[in-house]
């Protein structure tokens, strides 16, 4: 994980969450579930910056097992905090059953929902709504959104905006798999860099293409109430060949952050 990504996960996202929850939830007395915790860096950041009472990180992978290795040389931890727990879940696992004995005050999800399989999106949203307690919250963020300038998530290999929408699919795959090392990957072995590119392609191929409005509709459809939303725009100007096909707002909205509350 490069330093910019680490900073975004450990510092930026947890601090943004703390700001949004100010005056709404006493985080020091709350149990937070990090949906899509991955390496656990963000979960650790939530504990450090938000002082949450308890943090449960869940994901379909077990990358959290490398958390101490990931933070080595960056943070001074020899062991993980006792109030930080991780659990591996299956993609279609019902959260509400898994955590039936827990009181979940808020579910936090940062740059995760664009990776949920399309056919599981309604179930995932519904289970989040069922899992949080009455009066609890769901904090959901996506960036970059698929149709935005770098919604491909491939900008570290292909820096041209909207290239994933203007390039034939097999040609775009070739661009990814044949990309040359840049300064970010200069120290990677050739063998490892090839694996990195293959993993990048897998990420792109499994993006669900959800839009900001679709995300709102998805969660509002569960019965949750929208408390607040915030959208950010790209500074890039979409080409006319795309604005002739897509709504400009869909092309330029790169991030949505929304906070929902359960009755």
Report residues per predicted region:
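Class I SAM-dependent methyltransferase Rossmann-like catalytic core
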Residues: 1-25
